[in-house]
Amino acid sequence: MTNIWHTAPVSALSGEITICGDKSMSHRALLLAALAEGQTEIRGFLPCADCLATAQALRALWVDIQREKEIVTIRGVGFLGLQPPKAPLNMQNSGTSMRLLAGILAAQRFESVLCGDESLEKRPMQRIITPLVQMGAKIVSHSNFTAPLHISGRPLTGIDYALPLPSAQLKSCLILAGLLADGTTRLHTCGISRDHTERMLPLFGGALETQKEQIIVTGGQKLHGCVLEIVGDLSAAAFFMVAALIAPRAEVVIRNVGINPTRSAIITLLQKMGGRIELHHQRFWGAEPVADIVVYHSKLRGITVAPEWIANAIDELPIFFIAAACAEGTTFVGNLSELRVKESDRLAAMAQNLQTLGVACDVGADFIHIYGRSDRQFLPARVNSFGDHRIAMSLAVAGVRAAGELLIDDGAVAAVSMPQFRDFAAAIGMNVGEKDAKNCHD
């Protein structure tokens, strides 16, 4: 640990930000562009640690990628044009990079190894290994189906497969593998998960058929390079939405935010709590809906979150818990087993931090009760990001309603998904600074 973030409460928030490009879309654009023939230009690319891990892996597979700030140019190599890497491909902290790239590498004609940091190598990979092996892949994993993944590429055959959970990473892995396989791949989905891959593929000239709870992919297609504009990241915007809702005298505008209906549960849930959130200038960028979001300080109330909302809001739950702590009454969220196998055990980590901040909560194996108060002032305290970017940023938002300074261990881990977080925070009046850990004491 080399740094600590520190926050101070605010008397008001106001301002306007244009949020960074969407992380999920940036990953997918890189991968599809690499598989396409010809040149692709990606505008609004998110240069966060996770997406840069995907880019670096593709470079190691001999894909030409040039980046100038938020514009990335890629010369695609086609479905089987990737070349053997000289070393294991390090996905750092990015589960999306590992799971999606595994679907591509399984069909290549060479061997490769996917590894990551300590956190990533604890995350479950059986969900992708099982169907890829059914397609003909040869994958050797570490104990308990975790990374490193040793992949011996070989020709794949399409399968008929029922997804065991609503996971966009699993679904996208198999769509990519299906494109490279012989025959047809039929995926039977269970519940809603983000559909950026399905929306983006036709922009590259690819085709798939989407029916209710079924996706059909035919192998042997060709993709072609294109010019692609990445929408603003709703998961990133959610931090500033909650900051505006809980800060006094707040009015914040967030421009160009993607409002894909498979991602927008966080907006609905905050509105159900009484949050005043308005969507202005709704339009489309390519296949993705976009809006400018205006958020006002609001008196929130506790709610019970129905299970069907969880997959849609899984990445936003840490910041949602901060909103719940500032809502009057009890908020209940269940069906949270997936939250325990993210970059950290986010359920346990957020519960521990909430309690440190003076918030009463009860936690079970897959649920949490949060006992909120509309007059909440979080206790001044030192809290722990657990090396998790979304927890670090959620705790920074809590700082706007604290009774004094919050110290956040390893706040800089936010760069995994939003290196611009502190710049955006400053633009609307939040106080988030950084100091060296050796100068901080409990």
Swiss-Prot record:
- Source domain of life: Bacteria
Q: Where mainly found?
A: cytoplasm
Q: Which UniProt keywords apply?
A: Amino-acid biosynthesis, Aromatic amino acid biosynthesis, Cytoplasm, Transferase
Q: Could you state one GO cellular component term attached to this entry?
A: cytoplasm
Q: Where does 3-phosphoshikimate bind?
A: K23, S24, R28, S167, Q169, D315, K342
What residues form the catalytic site here? D315
Location in the cell reads:
Cytoplasm
Answer whether the UniProt record assigns the keyword Secreted to this protein.
no
| List of residues binding phosphoenolpyruvate | K23, G95, R123, Q169, R346, R390
Under Gene Ontology molecular function, one entry of this record is:
3-phosphoshikimate 1-carboxyvinyltransferase activity
EC no. given is 2.5.1.19
Q: What class of enzyme is it?
A: transferase
- Catalytic activity entry: 3-phosphoshikimate + phosphoenolpyruvate = 5-O-(1-carboxyvinyl)-3-phosphoshikimate + phosphate
Would the keyword Amino-acid biosynthesis turn up in this protein's UniProt record?
yes
Q: Which Pfam families match?
A: EPSP_synthase (PF00275)
GO annotation terms (biological process): amino acid biosynthetic process; aromatic amino acid family biosynthetic process; chorismate biosynthetic process
Pathway annotation: Metabolic intermediate biosynthesis; chorismate biosynthesis; chorismate from D-erythrose 4-phosphate and phosphoenolpyruvate: step 6/7
Summary of subunit composition and partner proteins: Monomer.
User: What family does the Swiss-Prot or TrEMBL record give for this protein?
Assistant: Belongs to the EPSP synthase family.
Q: Which PANTHER family match?
A: AROM/DEHYDROQUINATE SYNTHASE, PENTAFUNCTIONAL AROM POLYPEPTIDE
Q: What does this protein do?
A: Catalyzes the transfer of the enolpyruvyl moiety of phosphoenolpyruvate (PEP) to the 5-hydroxyl of shikimate-3-phosphate (S3P) to produce enolpyruvyl shikimate-3-phosphate and inorganic phosphate.
Official protein name in the record:
3-phosphoshikimate 1-carboxyvinyltransferase
State the species of origin. Answer: Dichelobacter nodosus (strain VCS1703A)
Q: Which gene encodes it?
A: aroA
